[in-house]
Amino acid sequence: MGRCYISQKSTLFGNKRSHSMNAIKRIWKTNLQSIRIEDENGKIKKIKISARSLKKLNFKRV
């Protein structure tokens, strides 16, 4: 299961409810993007980050 490197968001589990309130299991997956960034030592690191975090933090890609 994927997890965001910044916000630690992962998959959510729950129920989808119909009009008659019948419960149907479902999964909400995070919108993870795989990017390469450069760390403090100059090494290239590949991380998974959610689209929301990517938009908010404006990472400089390598």
From Swiss-Prot:
GO terms for molecular function: structural constituent of ribosome. Signal peptide: none annotated. One of its GO terms (cellular component) is ribosome. It holds the Pfam family Ribosomal_L28. Belongs to the bacterial ribosomal protein bL28 family. The keyword Transit peptide does not apply. The lineage of its organism: Bacteria, Bacillati, Mycoplasmatota, Mollicutes, Acholeplasmatales. Keywords: Ribonucleoprotein, Ribosomal protein. GO terms for biological process: translation. HAMAP family: Ribosomal_bL28. This is Large ribosomal subunit protein bL28.
